[in-house]
Amino acid sequence: MSESHLYTYGIIDDNESLALNVDGVAGATRAYTVSYRSLSAVVSDIETTDPERTDAAVEAHNTVLQAVLEHDATRAVVPMSFGMAFKNARTLKGVLRGARRALRSTLTEIAGTVELGVKVLAPGDDTAVDTAAVRSDVTARLSALSVGETENDCFTDRLIINKSYLVEHDTRDAFDAAIDEIDAAHDDLTVRYTGPWPPYNFVDIHIGAEQAQQGGR
């Protein structure tokens, strides 16, 4: 029988043990937590420390993180990038120990917030659109209701805006209402609103990659 390793999805506060029946990476059907002091890693069992990156695997990674958020909408989650698999719990706990200060700081920074995605697209025909005015209007409405925002790639000429916003739970309803107002004010455009997501675009922390690849030597 193959040795089981630990695939890691994200880091949360160690305020409770967590076990979720959810389809994860490499055929996993259950996600659970491995804890070190005030941190818990959300993991599932996996037979390799070098999982193949496929569209289905990335989707499964995101599905587990979504399930964590749905389990407790107020929970702060530091999402890990795809592919973080560790030889065993001892190796993972060692990484958590080494990165504890950075992880605790990040959890504090993102506590009480969620990431929301906003795309605004021009019509597919030749309808003239004042893109500068649209950007100005959308930015004015949404920036005041968020605590952070990032510009994402505009991968098609139709994309006028592609942004991620970090929004506090207390202002989420107001942000939702602002999206409805934008949609009504620009009925010739397509507004795509997604989330909540773990704050991928507002977390810049990389831990344990070398140890994961080396299998915890």
Curated annotation (Swiss-Prot):
Its main location: other. Coiled coil: none annotated. Induction: In PHH4 (a deletion of the p-vac locus) transcribed in all growth phases, maximal expression in mid-stationary phase. An unstable 6kb transcript able to cover gvpD-gvpE-gvpF-gvpG-gvpH-gvpI-gvpJ-gvpK-gvpL-gvpM is detected, as well as smaller transcripts. Gas vesicles appear earlier when grown in static culture, possibly due to O(2)-limitation. GO terms for cellular component: cytoplasm; gas vesicle. It comes from the Archaea. The keyword Hydrolase does not apply. Encoded in a 14-gene locus called c-vac which produces cylindrical gas vesicles only in the stationary growth phase. Binds GvpA. A minor component of the gas vesicle, may be involved in preventing GvpA aggregation during gas vesicle nucleation. Gas vesicles are hollow, gas filled proteinaceous nanostructures found in several microbial planktonic microorganisms. They allow positioning of halobacteria at the optimal depth for growth in the poorly aerated, shallow brine pools of their habitat. This is Gas vesicle protein F2. It comes from Halobacterium salinarum (strain ATCC 700922 / JCM 11081 / NRC-1) (Halobacterium halobium).
